[in-house]
Amino acid sequence: MVRKIGLALCILFLVGCGKYTMEEAKENGDIIVQNGVENSDRFESFLKKSKQGKSDQIRITAYTIEGDPILYDVKYNGKTYQYSSDASRDQFRSTEDDRKNEVCQQLDKTIVKQEAIYTLRQCAEGTDHELLRLPK
């Protein structure tokens, strides 16, 4: 009986550790997407630095309806962008779309209606990656 309780507590602990809370994301300076965008000024700073050819990196954390985080890491090295996505914390995940350090050549801004859409293009695996939509 004690073993079963110990096992149950261990499982609960491990499940709890796998969650990346919104509070953690805020503390880490992530750009947060859930019913809008929080910390968009960090994205603007990233854009400015990349236009100047300066290295920088960001994390965009998007939360699903269920509250599960999907992480998007973008690093700029002065020439190209490295893109990684991680849906491992999403209970309904499709890890076939996860990427690890995929190289993309450019970050484009497209205006559609009242939104600025930022997309990584010319990526090594042949797929563009939409990063963020901000009000114009």
Outline where the language-model segments fall.
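Serine/threonine-rich low-complexity intrinsically disordered regions
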Residues: M1, T21, E38-R42, S88, ...
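Compositionally biased, low-complexity repeat tracts
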Residues: L12-L14, A25, I32, V112, ...
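Extracytoplasmic electrostatic interaction patches
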Residues: I65-K136
